[in-house]
C-alpha cells in the first residue's frame, strides 16, 4: 500500500486546488482499508475518504486522506432482462455510463458528466435530470469504522437530496446496481444531454462541479446569476461564464480564495433573495486540535 507523509492535494481534486495533508494512503483491498482505519485511531486523527475529488476542495489538513482509486472494476450479471452490476468504489462513474449506453439501460445515462468515482457518487447521492444514483442501487458493501465489511440493501439506507448515510456509516467498498433495459432507444436522449453539458458547463477549466445545492423550489445557478455572480472572478477563482453555479480555477487558485468567493456568493444571494445557500462542494481544512472543519458535508 502506498503510504506517504505531508502530501500536496491539489492534483488529487478536479479543481486543482489544495493544501497538504499529514498522511495519505492508497489502499488496494479490504485489509488495507482496515489498516488505515486503525492508523487514524492510533494517531487520534480524522480520516477522510477521497474518490475522484470532484466535489472536494482541501486546505491544509491534519489527518489521513484515503484515496480509493486502486479499488476499481466492475462485473455484470444479466438475469431476465435486468443487469446486476457489481462495481468497486474507485471505479470511474463514466465507465458505468459507457456500459449503460452500450446496453441501452434506462435513465442511468442522465448521470453523465460527473467526473466522480462510484463511491463518491454514492456518498453524495449524485443526481441530474430527475434521477439520483440511489435510484439504481440494490445493495452497498461498506467498511464500518471498526474495520469490518458490512452489507446493506437499498431500502435499509436513508438517501435524500445530495445526501447519503456515508461516510457516517463507513467507507463505501463496492456497490451493486440494478439496471433495466429501456424499451426505446436512449441514444438520442444521451446525445442531447451530452450537448447540454458541453454548452453549459466549463469543461475546459478545472472545476469542482456544482458549488451549491438547489434550494427547495429554486435553482442555485439562477439565483447566483440574478445576483450578478455569473462570470464573477475573485483573484484566481470565479464562477463560470457558462454556468453561475460552477466554481472554476483560472490557474493558481487557493483554498482561501475559494472560501472568500463562496462567502461573497452566499451574502449576495441572501441580501437579494433572503435565501441561504448550502454548499454542495465540500471544503475541508484543519480546525485546531479537533481535526476537520467540513462545509457542505
From Swiss-Prot:
Instruction: Return the GO cellular component terms, semicolon-separated.
Output: cytosol
Q: Name one Pfam family in it.
A: FAD_binding_4
| Catalysed reactions listed for this entry | UDP-N-acetyl-alpha-D-muramate + NADP(+) = UDP-N-acetyl-3-O-(1-carboxyvinyl)-alpha-D-glucosamine + NADPH + H(+)
Q: Which Gene3D superfamilies match?
A: 3.30.465.10, UDP-N-acetylenolpyruvoylglucosamine reductase, C-terminal domain, Uridine Diphospho-n-acetylenolpyruvylglucosamine Reductase, domain 2
Pathway assigned to this chain's UniProt record: Cell wall biogenesis; peptidoglycan biosynthesis
Superkingdom, natural source: Bacteria
Q: Which residues cross the membrane?
A: none
Q: What GO biological process term is on the record, naming one?
A: peptidoglycan biosynthetic process
Report keywords, A-Z: Cell cycle, Cell division, Cell shape, Cell wall biogenesis/degradation, Cytoplasm, FAD, Flavoprotein, NADP, Oxidoreductase, Peptidoglycan synthesis
Oxidoreductase listed as a keyword = yes
Q: Which residues catalyse the reaction?
A: 162, 210 (proton donor), 280
Q: Which family does it belong to?
A: Belongs to the MurB family.
| HAMAP family reported for this sequence | MurB (MF_00037)
Protein name as annotated: UDP-N-acetylenolpyruvoylglucosamine reductase
Q: Which organism is it from?
A: Aquifex aeolicus (strain VF5)
Lineage of producing organism: Bacteria, Pseudomonadati, Aquificota, Aquificia, Aquificales
Protein's gene: murB
Amino acid at each position: 500500500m502506498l503510504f506517504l507523509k505531508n502530501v500536496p492535494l491539489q492534483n488529487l481534486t478536479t479543481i486543482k486546488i489544495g493544501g497538504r495533508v499529514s498522511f495519505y494512503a492508497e489502499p488496494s483491498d479490504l485489509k488495507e482499508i482496515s489498516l488505515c482505519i486503525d492508523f487514524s485511531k492510533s494517531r487520534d486523527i480524522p480520516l477522510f475518504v477521497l474518490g475522484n475529488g470532484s466535489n472536494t476542495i482541501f486546505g491544509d489538513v491534519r489527518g489521513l486522506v484515503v484515496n480509493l482509486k486502486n479499488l476499481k472494476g466492475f462485473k455484470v450479471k444479466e438475469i431476465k432482462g435486468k443487469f446486476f452490476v457489481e462495481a468497486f468504489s474507485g471505479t470511474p462513474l463514466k465507465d458505468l455510463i459507457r456500459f449503460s449506453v452500450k446496453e441501452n439501460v434506462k435513465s442511468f445515462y442522465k448521470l453523465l458528466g460527473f467526473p466522480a468515482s462510484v463511491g463518491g457518487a454514492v456518498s453524495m447521492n449524485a443526481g441530474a435530470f430527475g434521477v439520483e444514483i440511489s435510484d439504481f442501487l440494490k445493495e452497498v458493501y461498506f467498511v464500518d469504522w471498526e474495520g469490518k465489511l458490512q452489507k446493506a440493501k437499498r431500502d435499509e439506507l436513508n438517501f435524500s437530496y445530495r445526501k447519503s448515510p456515508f461516510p457516517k456509516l463507513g467507507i463505501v467498498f463496492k456497490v451493486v446496481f440494478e439496471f433495466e433495459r429501456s424499451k426505446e432507444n436512449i441514444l438520442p436522449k444521451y446525445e442531447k444531454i451530452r450537448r447540454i453539458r458541453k454548452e453549459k458547463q466549463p469543461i475546459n477549466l478545472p472545476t469542482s462541479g456544482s458549488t451549491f445545492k438547489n434550494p427547495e423550489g429554486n435553482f442555485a445557478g439562477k439565483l447566483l446569476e440574478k445576483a450578478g455572480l455569473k462570470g464573477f472572478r475573485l483573484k484566481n477563482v470565479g464562477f463560470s461564464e457558462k454556468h453561475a453555479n460552477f466554481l472554476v480555477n483560472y490557474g493558481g487558485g487557493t483554498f482561501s480564495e475559494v472560501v472568500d468567493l463562496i462567502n461573497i456568493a452566499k451574502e449576495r444571494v441572501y441580501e437579494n433573495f433572503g435565501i441561504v445557500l448550502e454548499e454542495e462542494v465540500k471544503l475541508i481544512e484543519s480546525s485546531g486540535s479537533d481535526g476537520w472543519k467540513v462545509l457542505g458535508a
